[in-house]
Every structure is written in structure tokens, then in C-alpha cells.
From Swiss-Prot:
Name recorded for this polypeptide: Lipid-A-disaccharide synthase
Recorded GO CC terms: membrane
An annotated GO BP: lipid A biosynthetic process
Reaction catalyzed: a lipid X + a UDP-2-N,3-O-bis[(3R)-3-hydroxyacyl]-alpha-D-glucosamine = a lipid A disaccharide + UDP + H(+)
Organism of provenance: Francisella tularensis subsp. novicida (strain U112)
InterPro entries: Glyco_trans_19
Signal peptide: none
Length: 380
């Protein structure tokens, strides 16, 4: 069996890593190849191109690096047309993967898109391309199946999110603090996750550090910890080493899972990390900034959308504070961080609600995906 997979960024690599591991157990002799990251490679995946080349965000970044992406996309399409997989799975990265899927489906290759494009937020017209590109959408959020069914008469299959299964409902934080060498710490632990892409980290890290400095100046005592999302971010972190050191922030060259599981509270970028923090039952403050042009065009396309962070989307209310674009200022971050430290009753409520959502999301994701995959292959 030959299976093609393309994951476009770290969150896709996390999903792909557990999926490739499960596929290898089910089909030990399968060739599984395409584009992936370190977690997928560790599970036995062969990456034909570096995943980092696809990890872009915002219109300016796409314009500046778009030609390389288009070149890689054309090469991967040609490769799979010449080395036809039994099935192709595009993990997230819809602007890249839907075109790949459409091209491969046109020559008779079965395609799956894993992680629905957020057409319920913006660019809903993409449903036309989705219909042409993919045989199945695998949804990771519970409400998406009804959205596709009721609004577009298109089948999306809820497979859950592997993080919901892999992260325990009740976390032994002491275990992860010991693992990170924080055994003797008696202060509240605040995890700081400014993103995984160079562009977002360069915008958010300086703001986050200044807000934390104001928190320290106001007399708040805490221990801040921060994961290094990937080695390529080291030069950027080094640029802010003096501030990081003066705040006593420990930077760990480990995945975000361990850092979040060791934490009491979190300050982080909007994105998949907010889902992970929610599953770790962390009250949090979310911030995000795009380039001005990306933000302008994005707002023109999106309009007034209520929520950006996964916890708010899933809870259908602003259960945690999200500070987006011009609201993402040092003063606003500082104000919300103070509330995070001061309002224990609110934090207890947040933890209770996160636990409810987590229980609803638990499903054996990989087994469900393999079941869908088997059915599609048998019918072909």
C-alpha cells in the first residue's frame, strides 16, 4: 500500500505524527510519503520536501515566498501522479492541499482532507473547491459535521482531535514539573507560547515580554516557562535573551505539551495551541497580530466574526479573553494577565467548562480515520 500525506505546519505534523504511527501499525509494509515534519518522520514517514517551506501566514508572507510554495506544490503533484498512492491525505494547510487534492482526484486518486478549512469563519466560497478536491472531510470540531450537512449538503465525518484522547482529563502537573526540573518551585507557573512561525513570534514575543515585565513591576510573583517551538526560532529568541533572562523565564527545547501540562495559567498566540491549553484545563489570555495588510484584507473577507480562539468557538462564548490586532497591546495584555492571577472564582469556572468540552471531544481519532480510509479503498 502507498499513502500520500502533506502536512503544512507544526500543528499538522502533530496530527500527522499520531496518524502515521497508527497507519504503520495497521499497514507495517505501507509506503507513507509526502511532506511532513519531525513527528511524522519519527513515526516512519518519508518527507520529500521540508515542511518549514510551507509554514507561512498572512498575505505579505505569501506574496514574498509564494513562488517557492507554488514550485513545491507542482513538484509534489507531479510526483504523486507518477507514483500514485492508494489514497492521499491533506492535513490542514487548505490553500496548499486543496489544489493538490483536486489535481490528484482528477486522475482517479482518492483524497481526504483532514481538518476542515474554517469556511464557517471566512471564505465560505471555498466549498466549491472542496467539493471538487476531496472525497471526504475529516472534521476535528464537533459542530462542523452539522455545519456541512445543513448548509452545504456535504459529508464531513467527525473524527475528534487526537489531543483530546492523548491529554488526560485530569493532569498530574507535579509529574510534568518534575520532568522539566521545576520540582522546588512554589510559585504559580505561567506558560508563554508566542507562536510557532517566525512572523508571528517576531510580532508577539516583544509584546508578551513587556506585559510580563509590567506584571513583575506591579508585584506579581510567578514562574514563566516557554517552549522553543522549533530550532529555527533560536536566533529570534536570542534577540530577546536579555529580557527573557531578566524575567527569569526558562526556555525548554521540548514540545508545548510538557510545558502546558506543567502550567497553572497561560499566555499564548491564537491557534491550535489554544485548543491544547484548553485540554490542559488552563485559564489563559490569547493575543494575536498580523501585518497591517494581512489584517485589512482578512477583515474584508471575514467581516465581523465573533471568536478566534478555539475555547471560545467551542464554548460559544468568550470564556477566555482574546486580544486581536489593535487590541493586542502591552497594556491590554497586562490588564488581562492581572485578572488571570486575581480572579480565582472565574478560573475555577473556566477549568470546569474546559473539562466538560474535553469529555465531549474524546474519541479514538486514528481508528476512526483508518476505518474511513479502509472503506474508501475497498470501494475503489
Amino acid at each position: 500500500m502507498r499513502i500520500g500525506i502533506v502536512a503544512g505546519e507544526l500543528s499538522g505534523d502533530q496530527l500527522g505524527g499520531t496518524l502515521v504511527e497508527a497507519l504503520k501499525q495497521k499497514y507495517p509494509n505501507a509506503i507513507i510519503e509526502g511532506i511532513g515534519g519531525p513527528k511524522m518522520a519519527a513515526a516512519g514517514f518519508k518527507s520529500l520536501y521540508p515542511m518549514d517551506a510551507l509554514s507561512l501566514i498572512g498575505f505579505l508572507e505569501i506574496i514574498s515566498k509564494g513562488l517557492r510554495i507554488l514550485s513545491i506544490r507542482r513538484k509534489i503533484i507531479n510526483y504523486f501522479k507518477q507514483n500514485k498512492p492508494d489514497i492521499f491525505i491533506g492535513i490542514d494547510a487548505p490553500d496548499f492541499n486543496l489544489t493538490v487534492e483536486k489535481e490528484l482526484r482528477s486522475v482517479g486518486i482518492k483524497t481526504i482532507h483532514y481538518v476542515s478549512p474554517k469556511i464557517w469563519v471566512w471564505r465560505e466560497y471555498r466549498i466549491k473547491k472542496i467539493r471538487k478536491a476531496t472525497d471526504k472531510i475529516l472534521a476535528i470540531l464537533p459542530f462542523e459535521t452539522e455545519y456541512y450537512k445543513n448548509r452545504h449538503k456535504f459529508e464531513a465525518i467527525y473524527v475528534g482531535h487526537p489531543l483530546a484522547k492523548n491529554i488526560p482529563i485530569h493532569i498530574d502537573r507535579t509529574k510534568y514539573r518534575d520532568k522539566l526540573g521545576l520540582k522546588g518551585n512554589s510559585l504559580p507557573i505561567l506558560s508563554v507560547l508566542p507562536g510557532s512561525r517566525t512572523t508571528e513570534v517576531s510580532r508577539l514575543l516583544p509584546l508578551f515580554l513587556l506585559a510580563l515585565q509590567k506584571l513583575v513591576d506591579a508585584g506579581y510573583k510567578f514562574k514563566a516557562i516557554m517552549p522553543l517551538a522549533k530550532p529555527s526560532l533560536k536566533p529570534l529568541f536570542a534577540k530577546y535573551k536579555e529580557q527573557i533572562d531578566s524575567l527569569g523565564i526558562e526556555v525548554f527545547e521540548t514540545n508545548s505539551h510538557d510545558v502546558l501540562k506543567a502550567s497553572d495559567l497561560s499566555l499564548l498566540a491564537s491557534g491550535t495551541a489554544t485548543l491544547e491549553a484548553m485540554l490542559c484545563k488552563l485559564p489563559m489570555v490569547v493575543g494575536y497580530k498580523l501585518s497591517w495588510l494581512s489584517a485589512l484584507i482578512g477583515r474584508m473577507l471575514i467581516g465581523n466574526h465573533s471568536y478566534w480562539a478555539f475555547p471560545n468557538i467551542l464554548h460559544k462564548s468568550e470564556i477566555i479573553k482574546e486580544l486581536i490586532q489593535e487590541d493586542c497591546t502591552v497594556d491590554n495584555l497586562f490588564s488581562e494577565l492581572k485578572r488571570l492571577f486575581d480572579d480565582k472564582q472565574r478560573n475555577d469556572y473556566i477549568v470546569e467548562e474546559f473539562e466538560k468540552i474535553h469529555k465531549e471531544m474524546v474519541i479514538d481519532t486514528e481508528s476512526k480515520i483508518i476505518q474511513v480510509l479502509n472503506t474508501m479503498i475497498e470501494k475503489s
